[in-house]
UniProtKB/Swiss-Prot annotation:
Protein name in UniProt: ORC1-type DNA replication protein 4
CDD domains named among the record's database cross-references: Cdc6_C (cd08768)
GO biological process, one term: DNA replication
Phenotype on disruption: Not essential for normal growth.
Tagged with keyword ATP-binding: yes
Pfam family, one: AAA_16
Origin species: Halobacterium salinarum (strain ATCC 700922 / JCM 11081 / NRC-1)
InterPro entries: AAA+_ATPase, AAA_16, Cdc6_C, Cdc6_lid, ORC1/CDC6, Orc1/Cdc6_arc, P-loop_NTPase, WH-like_DNA-bd_sf
HAMAP family: ORC1_type_DNA_replic_protein (MF_01407)
Residue sites binding ATP per the record: 73-77, 220, 232
Keyword terms: ATP-binding, DNA replication, Nucleotide-binding, Plasmid
Length: 410
């Protein structure tokens, strides 16, 4: 029985004996992996990924897979779901290990490998102890290899938000471990990124070693978003959701790019807003308040997780927006401001081409909007860039980075 659904009373009057809004709030957690019948609109992606991992079920090598798609399109959920099913489907005598690494948290090679070793190790079975800190990267790799060979025939490793990893050689070392004679166990890597150009920017040796298939996850449409949320309706007590709550939450998420994570986040926040207000029902107004809150959270997460160069590019566009009556600026003008910022912060200045790529990545993430404008036969075609979020909010968020704060001391 979950804590939210428990009907038993508590002795302290400070705390409620149940929850008048939520019945099972865990269904609304971002990392929650639902049962197969609750996963919406991803049958084709599940089937394709399963084919790539099929070798592991029979004791052979799974393939490496690179998954692209915007935030909230089910990339992590489907990866975890298929890995769970592969473990359950393994032939008799075949042991499959799976591990999930969030590269936003474990963003160095040492952190990622030590986390993998700790998550995959069953000390009672292997007799191997994996300390959280204190060892060199090479020693953590050796512990990982020993752990894998002691327990598994195949291992599938999910590296989520791989673009935030500061050393892409981890892809090469994991995918080549068996070939290099480090282990007898087969290793397959599922690398997940919001950035469609990620592989184009990795080291050539890594690119050559990480032989992979690609999957692209399209955004959910409004109908799919509604179905996803109706499948989580039992997270709430019976009768507390007004009939317009789920359609409105889905509509807000569909306006962006079909972000299921955002839709679920809005629904959860709406319940929390209603609870804090002492309401008996979750209403449309609670959803609207939750949407504003979720949008700020989403934006801060995107900007705070961006590399330093991306923050400098966004700061350049932000400064132009704050100090001008215009809201859209040619790439050349934004680049001039970017150069000024980099010089002031003593940062390396990227080429114009790489700078354009960064702006495109931010447009892909929904932070920047890019529009082509035609200045005629003499002027040619140019790109204009504008911030989607309020410029003051963007500026405040970027300046939370200590490296960027020096800009305010100009």
């Amino acid at each position: 029985m979950t804590p939210d659904s428990s009907p038993s009373s508590v002795d302290d009057p400070l705390f409620e004996s149940g929850h008048r809004i939520f019945a099972n709030k865990d269904l609304l957690k971002i990392g929650h992996v639902p049962e197969a019948d609750r996963i919406v609109g991803r049958d084709e992606e599940i089937s394709k990924l399963a084919k790539r991992l099929n070798g592991a079920v029979h004791g052979y090598s799974p393939e490496n897979v690179m998954i692209y798609g915007k935030t909230g399109t089910g990339k992590s959920l489907v990866s975890k779901h298929v890995c769970q099913r592969a473990q359950n489907a393994a032939q008799d005598g075949v042991e499959i290990g799976t591990a999930y690494i969030d590269c936003a948290e474990d963003n160095t090679e040492t952190q990622a490998i030590s986390s993998l070793a700790a998550k995959l190790n069953d000390e009672s079975s292997t007799g191997i102890s994996v300390p959280h800190t204190g060892l060199s990267t090479s020693k953590y790799y050796k512990l990982l290899w020993k752990t894998l060979d002691a327990q598994f025939d195949s291992v599938i490793i999910i590296l989520d938000e791989i673009d935030l990893m500061n050393d892409d050689s981890v892809l090469m070392k994991l995918s080549r471990a068996e070939e290099a004679g480090k282990i007898d166990c087969s290793v397959g890597v599922i690398a997940i990124s919001n950035k469609i150009q990620y592989v184009d920017n990795v080291n050539e040796r890594v690119k050559s070693s990480f032989q992979h298939k690609e999957l692209f996850f399209k955004p959910y449409d409004a109908n799919q978003l509604r179905e996803i949320m109706f499948n989580r309706e039992d997270a709430f007590q019976d009768g507390v959701l007004s009939e317009d709550v789920i359609p409105l939450s889905a509509a807000f998420a569909a306006q962006e790019h079909g972000d299921a994570r955002k839709a679920i986040d809005i629904l959860r926040h709406a319940g929390e807003v209603a609870y804090e207000a002492g309401a008996e029902l979750v209403t449309e107004e609670h959803v609207r308040q939750a949407q504003q809150h979720a949008e700020k959270d989403r934006f801060r997460e995107l900007v705070n997780g961006a590399p330093t160069q991306a923050k400098a590019a966004l700061l350049a566009l932000t400064e132009l927006s704050v100090n001008s009556n215009d809201d859209a600026f040619l790439t050349s003008r934004v680049y001039d401001q970017y150069e000024h910022i980099c010089n002031h912060l003593d940062m390396d200045i990227l080429s114009v081409r790489r700078f354009r790529d960064i702006l495109k990545e931010q447009a892909f993430l929904g932070v920047v909007e890019i529009e082509k404008i035609n200045k005629g036969s003499a002027g040619g075609i140019h790109l204009q860039n504008r911030l989607i979020e309020d410029s003051q909010v963007v500026r405040e968020t970027i300046l939370e980075d200590s490296r960027m704060q020096d800009w305010t001391r100009e």
